[in-house]
Curated annotation (Swiss-Prot):
It comes from the Bacteria. It is an enzyme of class 2 (transferase). The gene is argJ. GO terms for cellular component: cytoplasm. It comes from Bacillus thuringiensis subsp. konkukian (strain 97-27). This is Arginine biosynthesis bifunctional protein ArgJ. Heterotetramer of two alpha and two beta chains. Catalyzes two activities which are involved in the cyclic version of arginine biosynthesis: the synthesis of N-acetylglutamate from glutamate and acetyl-CoA as the acetyl donor, and of ornithine by transacetylation between N(2)-acetylornithine and glutamate. Belongs to the ArgJ family. It is found in: Cytoplasm. The record marks 194-195 as: Cleavage. InterPro entries: Arg_biosynth_ArgJ, ArgJ-like_dom_sf, ArgJ_beta_C. Its main location: cytoplasm.
Length: 408
């Protein structure tokens, strides 16, 4: 089945409140100095939901509470997020605090307790100041205005320099359906689902099981293919909510527009993943690695992520040095079976290696292209038909400075 790309359009200035039924709010309650630090997304109706969580064995209290909510009801109506404190490694008291946040949210928004998800991001190992949290939740008044959605996107940030939002419109059953997303993430990014949070809203009519299948698959190709510093976080999660208020027929794998929905969801996740990679702590450049001609998609993704995660590749890109030897070395370290004699590498569309032979190129032209904000590395294996991509950023002096002083 061909994906109806023509029926998918990016919505400029769209946000998580663009899909029908959603409102949002972000505000400052004092968890961070002079910055927004508490937010909420609320749906007019119980929404079908799906989620993907960190694979870090240490999982923060809010993540455990959210898992409990989604497993119990398979629907959500509100998400409460705080930044500035991760509520991770805070013992039984931390878990009690996360459950209290869920109760407070349910009471404040007038929804069932198990319809509330909780997320936190920030410093690990510090108890939540619940007196501030309690007062803060009581002040949340979500609205359907775009500016409140943007306020939410600010409230979930930690060391991020920019907010991360995206929105698409698609046609399902001949009706307009919207899907949007917001994310935070800058450091500790090396997901298998890093610190990374993402929230997706849509007015598509889709049930939990189907949405979960789609989100899990797409996460593997998008969020799990970004890396900033090779660390995974205790708090990462991606949550999707579907209000169903577009009033289409239920979307499932047999639906004529199934691939249209999947493609739109993938575009949202890919946009957010790239924005996270580009906003890596201290980053000055986005790095995209595409591996083509692999035997399997998994092998292509593994090689791409190996390259983009290499500190030597990252520092070379930061220094605008076309040291492709670091790229070929990373390929060899990936533990994927390759044929060194068939590999081709291009850097910013300039061939640097072909059939194990170094290629002559203009140093001046290469230097100019490496000054660009987005760097693309293409690797051609010539072993099969599969492809895979990964995204990351350069490694700068500023990264060390930011993380050396994070708590202070």
């Amino acid at each position: 089945m061909m994906i109806k790309i023509a029926s998918i359009t990016k919505v400029e200035n769209g946000s998580i409140v663009t899909p029908k039924g959603f409102s949002a709010i972000g505000t400052a309650i004092g968890l961070k100095k002079e910055k927004k630090d508490l937010g909420a997304i609320v749906c007019d109706v119980p929404a079908s939901c799906a989620a993907v969580y960190t694979t870090n064995q240490i999982q923060a209290a809010p993540l455990q509470v959210t898992k409990d909510s989604i497993t119990t009801e398979r629907k959500l109506q509100a998400i409460i997020v705080n930044s500035g404190n991760a509520n991770a490694c805070t013992g039984m008291k931390g878990l009690q605090d996360a459950y209290e946040m869920r109760v407070l949210g349910a009471e404040h928004f007038g929804v069932k307790e198990n319809y509330v998800a909780v997320a936190s991001t920030g410093v690990i190992g510090v108890p939540l100041p619940m007196d501030i949290i309690r007062k803060g939740i009581a002040t949340l008044i979500p609205a359907k205005e775009e500016n409140e959605a943007h306020s939410f996107s600010e409230a979930i940030l930690t060391t991020d320099l920019i907010t991360k939002e995206t929105c698409y419109e698609m046609s399902i059953d001949g009706k307009k359906v919207m899907i949007a997303g917001v994310a935070k993430g800058s450091g500790m990014i090396h997901p298998n689902m890093a610190t990374m949070l993402s929230f997706i809203t849509t007015d598509a009519h889709i049930e939990h099981d189907v949405l979960q299948t789609a989100l899990s698959q797409i996460t593997n190709h998008t969020f799990n293919q970004i890396t900033v510093d090779g660390d995974t976080s205790t708090n990462d999660m991606v949550i999707a909510m579907a209000s169903g208020l577009s009033e289409t027929k239920p979307i499932n794998m047999e639906h004529a527009d199934w691939e249209t929905f999947v493609f739109a969801l993938q575009k949202v996740c890919e946009d957010l993943a790239k924005k996270i990679a580009q906003d890596g702590e201290g980053a000055t450049k986005l790095i995209e690695v595409n591996v083509l001609g692999a035997q399997t998609n998994e092998e292509a993704k593994k090689i791409a992520k190996q390259i983009v995660g290499s500190s030597l590749v990252k520092t070379a890109i930061h220094g605008e040095d076309p040291n492709w030897g670091r790229i070929i070395s990373s390929i060899g370290q990936s533990e994927v079976a390759i044929n060194p004699n068939t590999i081709e590498i291009t850097l910013q569309s300039i061939a640097v290696l072909k059939n194990s032979e170094p290629q002559t190129f203009s140093e001046e032209e290469m230097k100019e292209r490496l000054q660009e904000d987005e760097i693309v590395i293409n690797v051609y294996l010539h072993l099969g038909e599969e492809t895979g991509s990964a995204w990351g950023c350069d490694l700068s002096y500023e990264y060390v400075k930011i993380n050396a002083c994070y708590r202070t």
